[in-house]
Amino acid sequence: MDKQRVIDLLDQLSPILAGKEETIGKELTEKLQSALLVTKKDVASKDGVALATSLSGFVQTISNASLPGTNLRFTDQEGPVWEELKALTEQTREDGLRGLHLTI
């Protein structure tokens, strides 16, 4: 996985999330920004299954905030950042599981 690309995507996602405060509220915005910062630190310091778990947790947090009945929506311009981060996370998870199966 290209850790630098993931960090770049997280950096791009940060102002996108900050801009959603009016629609999703200050509390949820702060929660998502906090989760983003933790994930960014994890990307820099973790590898393998630990990294995949952290990224998956972050993607799940954002996905939950995007469920029907919530107000988090990405515009056509913002969507590609989110979609690429999800795709990289899925690939990392699959690679981590593949490595786990090889060691068992």
Q: What does each of the following model-derived ranges do?
A:
Residues 21-68:
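Amphipathic alpha-helical interaction modules
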Residues 62-104:
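Amphipathic alpha-helical binding modules
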Residues 3-38, 94, 100-101:
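Amphipathic, heptad-repeat alpha-helical segments
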Residues 2-6, 25, 32, 44, ...:
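Intrinsic-disorder-associated interaction segments
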Residues 8-9, 36, 50, 54, ...:
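Acidic/proline-rich low-complexity IDRs
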